[in-house]
């Protein structure tokens, strides 16, 4: 019987197996940020250990930093975490993309754009959305702080092999429908626990038409379905994306030959299989307090089915049967490790070009990295956004989570391109609606959700 992509990635990294069936995996890349690393580094200090492979470790600052004035850090705890990461990286000789550095940005944005993320690697980070890197045919997953310490000290990690889920995507997306809508559809249909105990492998003709940044969006939110990771077999688009980047292999051709072997064999069998035809998918909007509580833009909100629905409706200030078009939007956030890359900003800019943000709506665009910001500014996207009434910010996690100054006031609604809509995720009492960049941009113009498919935009930007 053939092997799944998961099998090939896993077997290449097993150092040994213990009597309990746990495998000791070698880790090829360890990404670090300021929130989940302080105790891990302190653990090394207390046991008089060093970082085993600083050359396979890379740190950045993203979660806590302000995006309006990056040097004015008024939160004492945030400043302490940033200062601590800076000191830890210096002491343990770990490369750091500090505030203001050209390589700084959200950890799951800079990994791919710097060429650190590569097919065939095992990649970990003390962050649940590490699954993003699986878009490159890497086995990438989030870990806890104690595991961060273990990887720093040994460059290995004890893990139990998950099962493999195949998610086949067939058909062509309509204009105005994106990878974000696919994953929100998957979650709304199958729930937030469908992937528990599995690694999701996305494949099929739809994947072949997607660019790398769309694939990253898919894998990024695999964790929202309970999966250990999301993966996509590398192809020519993957190789073209990696080639020439700063940390890409110097002996690129040799590595590329090995990467061509990373696919699921034709006679391999998944432990669970799901097939989705994307042809008739519509843009999605979440209405509740987990990512599975979502509906098509052309559907009404569902009826209450259980106590969780009742609590969600109450928290969100919505009612069953309400039209999605009637959901008010006071804030718009375009950013996060899900949708803050150049193509995301280009799509949003194409929607708002020559138009104005609705009075009373606060709209933020936060590039995922310094390089994304610079590239967008070279194309004049910042002018398009600012002329429309958006705030153009510095890179960081920003309004994705309430750990920095960018927060949504209590009781107000935010159209967000991020990945989580839990109670209080964007601030105490904040009401989060997950959508694509195009849908978020359109909501900023109207002050409520609209069907982006009916808007006259071409999905691309003219720079003339």
Curated annotation (Swiss-Prot):
Pathway membership: Amino-acid biosynthesis; L-leucine biosynthesis; L-leucine from 3-methyl-2-oxobutanoate: step 2/4
Protein source organism: Bacillus anthracis
Needed co-factor(s): [4Fe-4S] cluster
Residues at which [4Fe-4S] cluster binds: 337, 397, 400
Subunit structure of this chain's protein: Heterodimer of LeuC and LeuD.
Gene3D superfamilies on file: Aconitase, domain 3
Keyword Amino-acid biosynthesis: yes
Cofactor annotation remark: Binds 1 [4Fe-4S] cluster per subunit.
SUPFAM superfamilies (UniProt xref): Aconitase iron-sulfur domain (SSF53732)
UniProt name for this protein: 3-isopropylmalate dehydratase large subunit
The keyword Iron-sulfur belongs to this UniProt entry's keyword annotation: yes
């Amino acid at each position: 019987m053939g092997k799944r992509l998961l099998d090939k990635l896993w077997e290449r990294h097993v150092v040994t197996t213990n009597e309990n069936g746990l495998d000791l995996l070698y880790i090829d890349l360890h990404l670090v940020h300021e929130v989940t690393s302080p105790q891990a580094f302190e653990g090394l200090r207390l046991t008089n250990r060093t970082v085993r492979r600083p050359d396979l470790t890379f740190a950045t600052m993203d979660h806590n930093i302000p995006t309006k004035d990056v040097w004015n850090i008024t939160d004492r705890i945030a400043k302490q975490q940033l200062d601590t990461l800076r000191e830890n990286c210096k002491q343990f000789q770990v490369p750091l993309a500090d505030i203001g550095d050209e390589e700084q940005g959200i950890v799951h944005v800079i990994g791919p754009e710097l060429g650190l993320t590569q097919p065939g690697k095992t990649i970990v980070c003390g962050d649940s959305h590490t699954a993003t890197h699986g878009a490159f045919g890497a086995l990438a997953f989030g870990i806890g702080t104690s595991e961060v310490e273990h990887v720093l000290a040994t460059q290995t990690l004890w893990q139990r092999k998950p099962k493999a889920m195949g998610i086949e995507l067939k058909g062509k997306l309509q204009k105005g429908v994106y990878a974000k809508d696919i994953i929100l559809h998957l979650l709304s249909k199958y729930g937030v626990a469908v992937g528990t105990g599995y690694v999701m492998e996305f494949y099929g003709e739809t994947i072949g038409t997607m660019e790398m940044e769309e694939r990253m969006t898919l894998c990024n939110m695999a964790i929202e379905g309970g999966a250990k990771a999301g993966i996509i077999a590398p192809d020519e688009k993957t190789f073209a994306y990696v080639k020439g980047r700063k940390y890409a292999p110097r002996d690129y051709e040799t590595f590329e030959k090995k990467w061509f072997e990373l696919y699921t064999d034709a006679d391999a069998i998944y432990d669970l299989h799901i097939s989705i035809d994307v042809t008739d998918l519509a843009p999605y909007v979440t209405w509740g307090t987990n990512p599975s509580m979502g509906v098509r833009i052309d559907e009404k909100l569902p009826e209450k089915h259980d106590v969780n629905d009742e609590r969600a409706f109450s928290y969100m200030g919505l009612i069953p049967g309400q039209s999605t078009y009637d959901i008010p939007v006071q804030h718009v956030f375009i950013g996060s490790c899900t949708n803050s890359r150049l193509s995301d900003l280009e799509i949003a800019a194409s929607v708002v070009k020559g138009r104005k943000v609705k009075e009373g709506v606060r709209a933020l665009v936060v590039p995922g990295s310094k390089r994304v910001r610079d590239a967008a500014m070279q194309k004049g996207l910042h002018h398009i956004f600012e002329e429309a009434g958006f705030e153009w910010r510095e890179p960081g996690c920003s309004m994705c989570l309430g750990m920095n100054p960018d927060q949504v006031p209590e009781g107000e609604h935010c159209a967000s391109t991020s990945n989580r809509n839990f109670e209080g995720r964007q601030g105490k009492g904040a009401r989060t609606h997950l959508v694509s960049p195009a849908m978020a941009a359109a909501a900023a113009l109207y002050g409520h959700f609209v069907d982006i498919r009916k808007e006259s935009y071409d999905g691309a930007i003219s720079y003339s």
